[in-house]
Amino acid sequence: MNIIETNNLTKSYADFTAVSGINLHIPKGAVYGFLGPNGAGKSTTMKMFLGLTKPTGGSFTIDGKKYPDNRVQILKEIGSFIEAPAFYGNLSGEENLEIIRKILGLPKSSVAEALEIVGLTQFKKRLAKKYSLGMKQRLGLAGALIGKPPILILDEPTNGLDPVGIHEIRTLIRSLPEKFDCTVLVSSHLLSEIELMADTIGILNHGHLLFEGTLDQLKSGAASQGYPTDNLEDTFLALIDADNKHRGTVR
């Protein structure tokens, strides 16, 4: 069963098309790695799922509910971490999450639960402005996880972290579907992390979906075309390069 499906989903602006007729199939309970160069359309697609920008063509359903007919109900089922999360620096981590809890109408216990999931319980009283970058990323994840929504949309959750922080966040994300029966859509430029984290991947370039499937399916298809398959990064770069040449574009 797919918890998110798109049908020719498109987002066009006056001078370019950011997302061009893509058909995504995101399985329930999976970690879905969303890949592509800068400007490929990943963030735009995620923002459409969150109601932050409107599609100009096509449609999508989330948990069987069509957008925008069921917009409010859909958004209640999604936790998100888009770009660098903003916090009130003069409030503690706990107080920042309390604001989110009240907006969402969640029980008081949800704040403590979210802090525990991301490992910030012992730092909950510390002011957010005194958090390290890794702790801020964890707080952003806590904000997405609060209330344990069935769908998480995470845009570059390991951005700016050191190797230890990246490993910790990857391990956390990988554990979420099994622990909380949720689905994770995650984008990252760290292809080695997606290779370790994702069950299924989708690759975008210039708004077009080049591939969707498992890593084994990607390697099999790449090998048949003579592309390198030693690791995801080499395969990804070969696919993007071939597509750019086909379109007559250069990255």
Feature map (PLM): residue ranges:
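Conserved ABC transporter NBD signature motif
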Residues: 58-69, 73-74
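Conserved ABC ATPase "signature" region
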Residues: 98, 102, 108-124
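Catalytic Walker B motif of ABC-type/P-loop ATPase nucleotide-binding domains
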Residues: 152-156
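Helical segment within the ABC ATPase nucleotide-binding domain
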Residues: 167-180
